[in-house]
Every structure is written in C-alpha cells, then in structure tokens.
Amino acid sequence: MASGDTKTSVKHAHPCAERLSLQQEEGEAEDYCTPGAFELERLFWKGSPQYTHVNEVWPRLHVGDEATALDRYGLQKAGFTHVLNAAHGRWNVDTGPDYYRDMAIEYHGVEADDVPTFDLSIFFYSAAAFIDSALQDDHSKILVHCAMGRSRSATLVLAYLMIHKNMTLVDAIQQVAKNRCVLPNRGFLKQLRELDKQLVKQRRQAGPGAGELGL
C-alpha cells in the first residue's frame, strides 16, 4: 500500500481526548473538555476485565449485580450497611426496604430502566447524596447494584464521584473501570457528559479550592 493511502486511512482522536494526558499530568481543568461518547467508550474498553458478582470501585463503595443484592446472608457476612438499588421496582430487582427489614441495612431505591431513552440524570444528585452520606461513617460499606452491575449502577457511581469527589467524567470512568468491567448505555453516557460539562463550568467559575459543587 502506498504511503499516501496509509495516511488517508488514519482516524484522528477526538480533540478533547488528545488533551486528557495533559490534564492528568498538570492536575488542571483549564485544558479539559468533555470527550465524545466514542472516546469515553474506549476508556471503558481499556479498563479491567474483572466482572464478578461484586467489585469494590472506591473505598467501601461496591458495584454489584442482582445476585449480590438478593444474597442477604452474603451481604451481612461481608459487612454491608447500605444498599442502593438502581433497578428498584416490581419488574426489575424487586427487593425494597422490607427485604432487608430485619438487617442493619439502609436501603435507597431508584426505579430506572436500562434503556437509552430513560432519564437517569434526575436521580444523579439524590443517589450521590445517599452514597456520600453512607460513606461519612468509616465503618459503613455500600452496595450499588442493578441487574447486571454494568450500566445503571455504574452510571450512578460515576455521577457520585463527579459530584462529591470533584472528578471529571474521564477521571471517574478510569477509577471505576480499573476495578470492574462496566459500560453505561449510550443514553446514560450522554447524560453523564452533560453533568460533566455543567460541573466543569461551575468549577472554573468558582476557581481553585471551591470544593463540591452542583449541590
């Protein structure tokens, strides 16, 4: 193949993705812009191949599946104190607070469908607040789950890290994906991108050391 043909076949990365390493090295948000969906999906693909029933993705914060949530004995033995069900409801993972009523577990349900048209963003802040409140106690341990532990639950954990840990979407994806194989659907990725843009804008306006924003 001629060199000219080779050049024309090269696909250039999203311009925002080219800035990611620079932003990470400098610890600055000034050069950061939210990557497109394809570039974000590539970050998930580069992540951990681990896909067990449950994985710790942040200290005392675990993402898991339906089997983990239904295993009352396993939850108690593992020391879980909080459960966030991102697939709450009769036609999803039908647990609820009554399922754990005789256990020392605090429950929070989000009735969400794993389809691109579902607006999960309306639950971002309430779910993030529940996770953050749980982790205020050094002895607590929270499970965030859906049916498979890949899309709905992962999306809410990413939103938590962005809102309460001041991470960009890229930082949050890298943190979660290095510990568990996850991949939110395209609709949820779009909603996370919008959250990322809002938070980055707010942090730039607030300046350094502003702490948690968007609350």
Swiss-Prot record:
Catalytic activity: O-phospho-L-tyrosyl-[protein] + H2O = L-tyrosyl-[protein] + phosphate; O-phospho-L-seryl-[protein] + H2O = L-seryl-[protein] + phosphate; O-phospho-L-threonyl-[protein] + H2O = L-threonyl-[protein] + phosphate
GO molecular function, one term: protein serine/threonine phosphatase activity
Enzyme class: hydrolase
Keywords per UniProt: Cytoplasm, Hydrolase, Nucleus, Protein phosphatase
Catalytic residues in the record: C146 (phosphocysteine intermediate)
Alphabetized SMART domains for the sequence: DSPc
E.C. no: 3.1.3.16, 3.1.3.48
Entry binding sites for substrate: H145, C146, A147, M148, G149, R150, S151, R152
Major localisation: cytoplasm
Record has NAD as a keyword: no
Stored InterPro entries: Atypical_DUSP_subfamA, Dual-sp_phosphatase_cat-dom, Prot-tyrosine_phosphatase-like, Tyr_Pase_AS, Tyr_Pase_dom, TYR_PHOSPHATASE_DUAL_dom
Subcellular location: Cytoplasm; Nucleus
Domain Tyrosine-protein phosphatase residue range list: 53-201
GO cellular component: cytoplasm; nucleus; protein-containing complex
Gene Ontology annotations of biological process type: glucose homeostasis; muscle cell differentiation; negative regulation of ERK1 and ERK2 cascade; negative regulation of MAPK cascade; protein dephosphorylation
Quaternary state and interactors: Homodimer. Interacts with PRKAA2.
Protein family: Belongs to the protein-tyrosine phosphatase family. Non-receptor class dual specificity subfamily.
Annotated function: Dual specificity phosphatase able to dephosphorylate phosphotyrosine, phosphoserine and phosphothreonine residues within the same substrate, with a preference for phosphotyrosine as a substrate. Involved in the modulation of intracellular signaling cascades. In skeletal muscle regulates systemic glucose homeostasis by activating, AMPK, an energy sensor protein kinase. Affects MAP kinase signaling though modulation of the MAPK1/2 cascade in skeletal muscle promoting muscle cell differentiation, development and atrophy.
Identification of the protein by name: Dual specificity phosphatase 29
Organism: Rattus norvegicus (Rat)
